[in-house]
Amino acid sequence: MPSLAVPHLTPISNEHLVSSKEVVFFWKNRIEMFEKKSDKVKQAEHKARDDGVELESQFIMRVPKELADTVHEAINAGTIKDRLTIQLDPDLRYGEVRIDDQILYTKLVDLPTVVESYKTIDNKSFYKSADICQILICKEEREDETEKESPNKNKKKDPNKVDKKYLFPHGITPPCKNVRKRRFRKTLKKKNVEAPEIEKEVKHLLRIDNEAVRVDYEIINEEDKPMDELEQSDIKPYNDADDDLQDESTMHASEKTIMEMSSQRHLQVESDDDEASNFPSHRAPNMGVAVHDIFGEEVSSTDDEDEPDRGNNTMQRRVMEESSRLSADDSRMSDFFGASGSNTGAGVVKMEQNVFSKSMFGHEASSPKLSAAGSSSNLAAPSGFYDSQMLAKREEFENMEFIDEPQPQYTQQQVQQKINQLTRQIRELKAQQVQKSTEIASIQNATLKQRMQETLDNLYTQVIERELELKDFENMLES
């Protein structure tokens, strides 16, 4: 085992040391050859470097606690050169350290942190000498030979990659414990990308662009694009059938809302009749049916003033959502609700008074639909809920026959222009179909092929729509 002598050791004051049990040595990275001379002349001759620059590497030597004081005393006394020797293996990872007569087995590992070291001559000016990124750990027990041998001995190693057993997990300060695991994430592995296939697809797309008759492109900045601008694909043509469907759905929504409200009243009245025996005895008998007779206890009290009326807000929100579904532009619905405005106004006044008459809760159902939509009990809807005028209006509305609005009248010249325009559009769409079909036949990528097929199906749909419109205008022209 070759011996590397330490010709000069410079002690560092305790304020620059991380721990009093660690000593920093300046180990010169130069090969020194010592030859035995005669007893009169014994001096070391070293081989000079070609560039004349002596570089040095620094590391921290960590020794056991009982020997740390001995090393500090030797450094302060200036006898460290005679009392301490360091011997390292050729791989510069394992070695031995002799302190007086005691031998320690060492291992040089890499720190996860970098510590800067400074030198001074006059204790006033400091200059940086090196970056300390290794630590020499000294132990009394020899390390197992199995740990020295790498398990992946036969594998090809990267010369720039350090073996994991030489990577120290901790720093030199307590906050840096397990810093390598906590601070540094694992290196992401590069995914294998099939470059030839991608290059082939790109060349194919470029070849299609070169063979195209015309290529149009437009640069659109999404930030500068106004919000009210709509794409042509999002604008649907006006159709009278859609309007009729909307009117029908609005009518069903209004009927459903009325039926749900009546069913809720049925449930409340039934529960109140079951709990009639629990009413307080001091209530006046001639007051009629009050709010608490139907809804039980009071809706709110002074104890709940701190909290908002969540139930009322929720109910109002539901009513607003249901009412928002109704179309305000529908003349038939406005006529229906306008005629019954007086009756509903009277109903609101009654609700505000919070007093109900017992005649409202009869046993005969005023409407078969409402009785069917109510609760499963024998209690029917109140007889005075709908008056005769309201029922007459409702029957008139249900029996009303909806007449389609008249289509706009076109002159013969306008019809001919529409026919020419639709014929030109159909011709252009069919030309695009032929071009897209040719492109799809030559595409091998499944995802791109599916996307192109969707575009082709859209073109087929547009052609069918234009042909139907063309047939309508041709019929108008013949008539």
UniProtKB/Swiss-Prot annotation:
Basic and acidic residues bias locations: 148-166, 318-332
Annotated GO CC locations: transcription factor TFIID complex
Keyword Ribonucleoprotein: no
Subcellular location: Nucleus
Gene Ontology MF terms: RNA polymerase II general transcription initiation factor activity
Gene Ontology BP annotations: RNA polymerase II preinitiation complex assembly; transcription initiation at RNA polymerase II promoter
UniProt modified residues of type Phosphoserine: 233, 271, 277, 300-301, 367, 371
Cited CDD domains: TAF7
Main location (coarse class): nucleus
Annotated region described as Disordered, given as residue ranges: 143-167, 268-287, 299-332
Pfam families in UniProt: TAFII55_N
Modification type Phosphothreonine: residues: 302
UniProt keyword list: Nucleus, Phosphoprotein, Transcription, Transcription regulation
PANTHER family attached to this UniProt entry: TATA-BOX BINDING PROTEIN ASSOCIATED FACTOR 7, TRANSCRIPTION INITIATION FACTOR TFIID 55 KD SUBUNIT-RELATED
Family statement: Belongs to the TAF7 family.
Role of this protein: TFIID is a multimeric protein complex that plays a central role in mediating promoter responses to various activators and repressors.
Subunit comment: Belongs to the TFIID complex which is composed of TATA binding protein (Tbp) and a number of TBP-associated factors (TAFs).
Name of the protein: Transcription initiation factor TFIID subunit 7
Lineage, top ranks: Eukaryota, Metazoa, Ecdysozoa, Arthropoda, Hexapoda
